[in-house]
Amino acid sequence: MILKVINHDFIYDMKNLCTVFFPWEKINDDGKDNIEVETKAQGNEFFVCARLFDKSISKTHILKENEDAQTEMSVLLYNVLSELTGFKPPWGILFGVRPAKLMHRFADEMGEKAARNYFINTFLATPQKTDLAIEVMHHENKIISLSSHNSFSLYVSIPFCPTRCAYCSFVSHSIEKTHKLLEPYVDLLCKELEKTGQVAKALGLRLETVYFGGGTPTTLSASQLSRLFDVIEKNFDLSTLREYTVEAGRPDTVTEDKLMALKGAGVGRISINPQSFNDEVLDTIGRRHTSKQTIDAFALARKCGFNNINMDLIAGLPKDTLSSFKNSVDTAVSLGAESVTVHTLAMKSAAYMVTRENAYDISDKLLTFDMVEYSNSCLKSSGYYPYYMYRQSKSVGNLENVGWCKDNMDCLYNVYMMDETHSVFAVGAGAVTRLKNQDTGKIERIYNFKYPYEYIDRFDEIIERKKLIEKFYAN
């Protein structure tokens, strides 16, 4: 699509709002395309014109003395694109990742009631989404209050999967192609964990949560997982640990010996992620397992003593219907999962599934909206509450991802990560360490190399960067 920004500096907002309505489109500022948008400021007069194929709409707005120019230009563009497409994004002009955190800031500044009104009347968020942000904020606050000034969390990246799902944009690698990297990767990951633990102990930091993500951590063997757990136990002070999570993820990687290795290491929370309980959908997105395998893996985890199991579902997957999505939610609830995380499909450029097909069709957005609405009502009526939430760009319908849980089954790491409550020391390929200054709120990031082969080939540089953690805390 073509986007022209004339006589104003709000290009970031304009691009993000265009992406809300047309998530599959690449944005340029010249050439020809089926979609053209022009935003223009002339003194206190704002002008927006948009064309979709042979249909065009234009609107103007005269900026009043007490109005914020950036917000009003965004509202004008939102109104034009809503009328042009017939679609009103439920989060209005908001496109940030952390709506609950934003709500928290506004509630602190002006009070919760005024913040709610501001979300609805200024940002054009629906009352339902606004109230969701408020509810999540309240649950998050209880968890955030547990963190201390010197707290931190540990994230362990296992960027390998049995196969790569068609919707996935994460830096994860099929073990069919990278099996030979697994053992050297684990060897070096043990060394990075050892060094990171030494740094954390020397700084006198308090470890709150450990989270193994990926990828699919249970792509590793039971013995490889045990090696990592042993290194963590030997090099980190686990006496303050509140939560230990491993994403088992793909049910086709879940075995009894791996589950017992997790249990023996003190892992208390795992994820077994169906994404869907519709086998046709699973086949379409490249997940080589069946819904029965998910149910069997869940039963095996129960047999091994796990009483805090999360299940991930995705709304908006190809071949999924409202009826089959409802069945997926109902199945997760009937199994008794302690938490259910409902994601909205996000079409990232690195995913195999990205296509312009149906890019202008509102029906996909409305179907996904109905799916999310059903999950919200079903989970709430089944005794779950929303404890954390985040949003992604290019999600279908500009919807959200929400973690729902039963009483006291919140994932602390998810909340700490999304709120940026404290530092997160991250190890492994693609991992990003986030260091938080508790006095200023400033976040500094240290990036590990993205790909396993880079991580292996340039490991000395990874270890050298640990000095940046010491430098940060010395200041």
Identify the function of each model-found stretch:
Residues H149-V186:
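Canonical Radical SAM [4Fe-4S] cluster-binding loop centered on the CxxxCxxC motif
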Residues S172-Y374:
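Conserved non-cysteine loop/helix-boundary elements of the Radical SAM core domain that shape
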Residues P217, K394, G430-T433:
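Short, glycine-/Ser/Thr-/acidic-enriched flexible segments
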Residues D33, A350-V427:
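A C-terminal junction/extension of Radical SAM enzymes
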Residues M1-E112, L189, D407-N475:
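Radical SAM enzyme core and accessory elements
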Residues L84-K88, F106-L154, L203:
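N-terminal [4Fe-4S]-dependent radical SAM core
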Residues V48-A50, V156, I272:
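Short beta-strand motif preference
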Residues Y167, A337, A426-V427:
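Short glycine-/small-residue motifs
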